[in-house]
Amino acid sequence: MNDVIIAEVVELGRHTKMELPTKRAAALFVGDVVGVAYGCRYATRQFEGVIPPGNGPCHLLSVGGVCGEVVGMPFDMEPPTILRPIGYLRGADGKRVNLERLGIVGSEPPFGAAKVILVVGASMDSGKTTAAYSIVHGLTRAGAVVAAGKVTGTASAKDPLIMEDAGAVKILDFTDAGFVSTAQCSSAQLWRILTAIGTHLAQANPDYIVLEIADGIVQRETQLLLALLRENGCIDFTVYTCNDSLGVASGVNALRKLDFEVVAVSGSVAYSPLAAREAQAQTDLPVLLREQLQDPAVEQLFVKHSAEGRDSAMKNLVLKFPTIPNPLSRTASSL
């Protein structure tokens, strides 16, 4: 894992571009010679990939330059881009270049004095990144200093860039710790990533650190990381994202059993008023749209309350968020 190889593009498929060190996605052409790194991928709506046993042809697993062998994919997805390995990239000492040896390291305990907000979801594409950058933006608008980190996932520059656009003063992810992907990482490796990200984000002296975990709460690495976060008391507040009300109820209950203080729900479930009401009835939590998370009032979510005071505080808080116009109120002339 994380070994860098030089490879030739043999056949274009799903990924027709690859990100450069400048973070620009460059077009790929058959015959191009590229630098990529071996890694696994776990993505229910993309590829499931593993590190191949030999040095034969492999696949491009992500736009971020992760390569491996695809062992599963959605039925409606294009086949992967095929690469032919030429050889390992080696340093001046003749050793293989492995990104893990070049990653940042941290200390314990991480995060410093910042309040840590965890964004975790039911699955891939449940709205985690949207919720995370929206919280960053809302807190920034409230006058807070906010840093952001993505602890797990597959290498891509897209998410860190949008966190920067949202106002985060410092952004780090698992790639900064030397991992092109966190699929199949051990607990020790995940803890190393977490402490590295937390330590270096804390150096910016933020009021808040917003952490996103990729994929869903039933995914192996997510479960390992949640256990680590719980054992070490790292998280102050949790926001859960989901696509439907039943998933909201089961996910929030699972997180509460792990002693995470879930303060709000977001994701695509929030965009159906009926589904949002169902979810709120199941959890007694505010179900918030992206636009509401981006409002300065979001900071009031992240205040510690007694068990007795939380229910009334949450009900009062919902009233302070801006009202999103109902689509039924549109007139023909405004469409």
Label the model's feature ranges.
Residues M1, T16, T22, Q282-P322, ...:
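NTP-binding/hydrolysis catalytic cores, primarily Walker-type P-loop NTPases
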Residues M1-I82, G87, A281-V287:
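Long, basic/Gly/Ser/Thr-rich N-terminal segments
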Residues V4-I6, D32-G35, C58, C67, ...:
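Structural motif
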Residues E8-E11, A177-S186:
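Short, basic, glycine/proline-bearing loop/turn elements
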Residues A26-A27, S62, E108-G112, G138-R141, ...:
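Solvent-exposed alpha-helices and their adjacent loops that cap or buttress functional pockets
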Residues L61-E100, I162, A188-Q203, Y208, ...:
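Conserved catalytic-core segment of NTP-binding enzymes
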Residues L102-T154:
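Walker A (P-loop) phosphate-binding motif
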Residues H137-S181, L255, L274-Q282:
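N-terminal phosphate/diphosphate-binding loop that engages ATP/GTP or pyrophosphate donors
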